Amino acid sequence: MDIINRYNRNEFFSADSIHFDTSLKYTTPGGRTVYGGGGIMPDIFIPMDTTGYTAYYNKVWNTNVLYRFTLDFTDRHREEVDAIKSLEQLDEFFAKHDLIKEFTAYAERNGVATNRHQLAVSRNTILAQLRAYIGRNTPMGDAGFYYNIYAVDEVLKRAVVEIKSRKK
């Protein structure tokens, strides 16, 4: 229930909504302020981005239709998928397929009617996830996943920026 309460208090969307018990305040030997009581406040707060979330997206996600499609798609194209050894080959493979068209047909066959307006709003999120989960099923594994999910994952994008800035 804590996660639902945090969501309802907007803690996923604004750092200003997160309140700490100051009686549990502690300063580390390195001079950082931390608070007891459980949980960790990250040094960098990235608000949750729900702009691509619609009722249609929630339905295909919560019924596992999106993930099941990627497994079915991978199985139907197993020989091609197993031959993918680079990100360039993965992009070439995806260029040959209209994933959104195939996915919406699959979703409809599995009881999720397509809402064209909501699909337009959620399209980039859905497409990135389709590509990511299919990419994970290639011999590249997680590299195929993260290469594709990066397009819509603001936390991952910021992490890359922070890591690169610390290497300088």
Predicted regions and their residues:
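Conserved functional hotspot residues or short segments at active or partner-binding sites
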Residues: 1-168
